[in-house]
Amino acid sequence: MASPGGAALQRHAAVSVLRAAAAACEFSAGKAIHAQMVRAAHFDVILHNHLISFYAKCGRLGLARQVFDAMPSRNPVSGNLLMSGYASSGRHADALALLRAADFSLNEYVLSTAVSATAHVRSYDMGRQCHGHAVKSGLADHPYVCNAVLHMYCQCGHVEDAVKVFENVSGFNAFAFNSMINGFLDKGKFDSSISIVRSMVGEVEQWDHVSYVAVLGHCASTKELVLGSQVHAQALKRRLELNVYVGSALVDMYGKCDCACDAHSAFEVLPEKNVVSWTAVMTAYTQNELFEEALQLFLDLEMEGVRPNEFTYAVALNSCAGLAALKNGNALSASAMKTGHWGALSVCNALINMYSKSGSIHDARRVFLSMPCRDVVSWNSIIIGYAHHGLAREAMCVFHDMLVAEESPSYVTFVGLLSACAQLGLVDEGLYYLNIMMKEMGIKPGKEHYTCMVGLLCRAGRLDEAEQFILSNYIRADVVAWKSLLGSCQVHKNYGLGHRVAEQILQLKPSDVGTYVMLSNMYAKANRWDGVVKVRKLMRERGVRKEPGVSWIQVGSEVHVFTSEDKNHQWINQITRKLKELIDQIKVVGYVPNFGVVLHDVEDEQKEEHLMYHSEKIALAFGLIHSPDGATIRIMKNLRICDDCHVAIKLISLVTARRIIVRDTVRFHCIEDGVCSCDDYW
């Protein structure tokens, strides 16, 4: 029989070996100690606890549970070790099951672990029970327990309960502070988050780097540039702007506050840049529509040896969407496939967006159908993509599939759905979605939905109803809704109403160039040339200048940009010859220049030249020169395509046997054999 001193020495040696084996994950060494303990009948609580810790750290939770269940007696550490093992392995339900059957006393460590587990599984009821137990046992004020309870309430969406706990926190608690801000931001309660920030400004010296990240996240979400700059100044004093997490948060804040240059400056000072900081600065550029710069940063990132993650790919793909750079998007898709990121939800959603906005809706559908899982963004992207391509029936079918899949529609879903209804003139269906289905789903209609309804009534030819709809809803001051009605007045030749609507728009926005253009067009179509002259005079008096039309087209890997009347391009001689050739060809099949869209007070011959050099025609000629016969031409434009270009491009598609896709600010125009997918209504 071993002496008491010898037994203690053996136990100490066993504990040392188990600790070392757990740290190195040496399963065989720890297992051997367990076997020796069984043979020597060493079964005190301390040795059992070390065995539980060893098995848990080696990922053998089944064996850890066997040791726990075989213990003749336990202390709080026993339960906490097993619960922590479950929690660390993501088995939060098992941790909570252990808590329910607990026959050991609960201390602050056990309770904080249990509450954290309820947060992970979003079990609000169980979390409240744990909180109640903490209150009864006098442990609710312990920092570990208090912080875990705050985090649990925020994670479960019960921020009001978290506020009650936070208000009873004594002194400054950085973790509690951070949890509250992030909880409010997750729920979109920005007013509440700013009140928390202001209450803690006096404790800024005690903020940790997580506090700075949380506050900067608030500033980014609310575009609080002044506060964000002040927080930046405090970070500079403590040299925290060099911390990669704080630095990345600064980049994100400046980007969302429309300060791309400041975002880049915050990025440049970082001594160590990781994929998070690279992605943050790319996002800042993309949010500020600096798409080419964002794609260049992606190339720089790869040159620096930083491996892009799924979010980096998503940002780069969204930049391609902004440029409608289909070839670059395809290259990124292939790269994501090679690096194993292609199936990620964020990447697939970005691919759907990129293909939709690049005029390749069939590829968008292919990605959507191949996704292993989808979220509401996936469904919204394909619905809106179909709607913008004039595929209204397909959009409505996808919406039906969305309901069958039990995915809850969002505010954005109904914008796409109502846009689809508008293209088909389905008034009754649109009113049903707006007044009944959205109400049943708890979604309050916004101005985007009401504007879609205006377009829907207009498409059905019910212009007077559309006017009354605008006047009877809170969109009566919304220029977009009135312009939708104005465009329909032009299509339906209701020039009397159109004149009244134009006056309404110009009262709201006297500098709206598009309204002057449409008003001039209506006067010209009605042979009211005195009205055209009047519009031109009014524009001169008010100093209103037509925004230059800009169109771009991708040829090879390069995006070529053209402005209206652009005669300085290196290919302008070839482009001019091609344009004259095309105009001669389409005149044979019925093209007549529409001088009504020309606001210049010049002779007809000069007006025809102005029309010929519209940016989309220049881009089209360039595309025809530099693409093989039969290839699809894709053109993007910064303004609504004018009536003359729309007619001309339809006829060019006929005489060249080309499929031509034009994306303007309203929709996609898929033109083939002289017919446009918009049915001449846009």
Question: Could you tell me what each predicted segment is?
Answer:
Residues 1-682:
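Terminal (and in a subset, N-terminal) low-complexity or junction segments at the ends
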